[in-house]
Every structure is written in structure tokens, then in C-alpha cells.
């Protein structure tokens, strides 16, 4: 039922996550559920899946990466965080403590001087350094839009317009009511939270 959107160019990454909580299938229980976990100054993770797994895995990941930065004096890069998340889900999958979560990881790598967008699903399948990614059923409606309209040199305004187009398509075609989305952008200057997309 949930929907995550990620769009990346060399200069920025835009992430959006729905704010809905569903119960008993498609019944909207809450419209203010935050699915974002900040992993660093220029690094964040959007997480969907089973509600308990999302809360536990998101918090566990956030605290472990914060501990790493305290112990070592620097934050991990976005690609390193992506590998850590993928390995954590893979190890959990082979134990009794597996997490049923799908994540999008976005950030800006100062060392490589470019934005990063990656995803990991609940079976630990990872995709790194992608131009656009979706998690959730609504993504099936949006890949055609991105295939047709995505450009590597899009401005932030063009990227946001394209993201809004995808969210609008999901709103129009998906059976469940998703009332709003949290939107963030990360670039060389840092992390910014933008106005929510509301319907």
C-alpha cells in the first residue's frame, strides 16, 4: 500500500515517502506517519513494510551508523550505508529476526562529489547508483513516466515537477487513498525538507 519515490541526478537526490498508515488492508488509520530515518548530515533512508519492522529496523540502522560516526570521527558514505543496510537485511533473512522492509537510501557523497540513490528490498536485493527508483505497488505506474521524461541534467524544479507527476499518477490510478507525502532533497549544500505534497 505504501509508496516511496526517489529521483537522482549528479547534483541532487529527491526522496518522497507517503505519510499513511494502513490497517486491515486499505483502511487509512493515520496520515502523519514519518517513514524517514536520517542516517547522516547528507544521508537519509525512507523505509516501508511491516510497521513494527520498519520502526525497529529504521531505528537500529540509524543508531548503528551514528555509533560508527562517533567511534571513527566521520560519517559513512551513501554507498557504504547502502551496503550496510543490504548486508543487515541479508543477515536477518538467514535468522529468525528477519525484517520485512523495503528502503530507499539517498544522499550526497562529498568525496565523489555526486548524489547517490539506492534501494534494498526485503530479500536484500540491492540496487545502487540509480537515476530513479520506486518502492511500493504505485511504482508500476511511474516507471513509464520516468523512462520518457527523466533527464540527467534536470534542474531541481524539473525534478520536483517530475516527482509530482508520478505522485499524481499514483493518486489517480491506485485504489488506496494516500493523502500526503513527505519530500526531502539532498545536494552539495546539505539536507532540506520541502513542503509536503497533500491531496
UniProtKB/Swiss-Prot annotation:
> Organism's domain of life?
Eukaryota
What InterPro entries does the entry give?
Ntn_hydrolases_N (IPR029055), Proteasome_beta2 (IPR035206), Proteasome_sua/b (IPR001353), Proteasome_suB-type (IPR023333)
Under the heading Pfam families, the entry gives: Proteasome (PF00227)
Which biological process, per GO, is one annotated for this protein? proteasome-mediated ubiquitin-dependent protein catabolic process
What are the UniProt keywords, alphabetically? Cytoplasm, Nucleus, Proteasome
Annotated localization: Cytoplasm; Nucleus
Gene3D superfamilies per record = Glutamine Phosphoribosylpyrophosphate, subunit 1, domain 1
Major subcellular location class: cytoplasm
Q: Which GO terms describe its cellular component?
A: cytosol; nucleus; proteasome core complex, beta-subunit complex
Look up keyword Magnesium and say if it applies.
no
Family to which this protein belongs: Belongs to the peptidase T1B family.
Free-text function comment from the UniProt entry: Non-catalytic component of the proteasome, a multicatalytic proteinase complex which is characterized by its ability to cleave peptides with Arg, Phe, Tyr, Leu, and Glu adjacent to the leaving group at neutral or slightly basic pH. The proteasome has an ATP-dependent proteolytic activity.
Report quaternary structure and partners.
Answer: The 26S proteasome consists of a 20S proteasome core and two 19S regulatory subunits. The 20S proteasome core is composed of 28 subunits that are arranged in four stacked rings, resulting in a barrel-shaped structure. The two end rings are each formed by seven alpha subunits, and the two central rings are each formed by seven beta subunits. The catalytic chamber with the active sites is on the inside of the barrel.
Q: What is this protein called?
A: Proteasome subunit beta type-2
The gene it comes from is: pbs-4
